[in-house]
Swiss-Prot record:
Keyword NAD in record: no
Protein name (Swiss-Prot/TrEMBL): Protein Tat
Region (Disordered): 55-106
Lineage of source species: Viruses, Riboviria, Pararnavirae, Artverviricota, Revtraviricetes
Gene: tat
UniProt-annotated location(s): Host nucleus, Host nucleolus
Stated role: Transcriptional activator that increases RNA Pol II processivity, thereby increasing the level of full-length viral transcripts. Recognizes a hairpin structure at the 5'-LTR of the nascent viral mRNAs referred to as the transactivation responsive RNA element (TAR) and recruits the cyclin T1-CDK9 complex (P-TEFb complex) that will in turn hyperphosphorylate the RNA polymerase II to allow efficient elongation. The CDK9 component of P-TEFb and other Tat-activated kinases hyperphosphorylate the C-terminus of RNA Pol II that becomes stabilized and much more processive. Extracellular circulating Tat can be endocytosed by surrounding uninfected cells via the binding to several surface receptors. Endosomal low pH allows Tat to cross the endosome membrane to enter the cytosol and eventually further translocate into the nucleus, thereby inducing severe cell dysfunctions ranging from cell activation to cell death. Through.
Length: 106
């Protein structure tokens, strides 16, 4: 066997290994030996880095979304108008009560 320094294709071999895509490894063990046995396992298990696309939440269908929004709008509008007017009346009655109530004398 030739020494590593005298091999002419050593640099090319190292570069080809460096830029080679990582192969999938289906070993689910997290022991030290399994975490360090390949670059993929080291990144995924050892460092906890995973470049896979994360699963996104399922969205509700547009039909269901449209029905709920229209129903919520119908419910909210009457509540707003119903609560706005009595608040003004309450404030007026409180102001009148404070103005007419005799204060505590000294």
């Amino acid at each position: 066997m030739q020494p590593l320094q005298n091999r002419p294709d050593l640099g090319e071999e190292i570069l080809s290994q460096l830029y080679r895509p990582l192969e999938a490894c289906y070993n689910t063990c997290y022991c030290k030996k399994c975490c360090y046995h390949c670059q993929f396992c080291f990144l995924k298990k050892g460092l906890g880095i995973c470049y896979e696309q994360s699963r996104k939440r399922r969205r509700t269908p547009k039909k269901a979304k449209a029905n709920t929004s229209s129903a919520s709008n119908n419910r909210l509008i009457p509540n707003r108008t119903r609560h706005c007017q009595p608040e003004k009346a309450k404030k007026e009655t409180v102001e009148k009560a404070v103005a007419t109530a005799p204060g505590l004398g000294r």
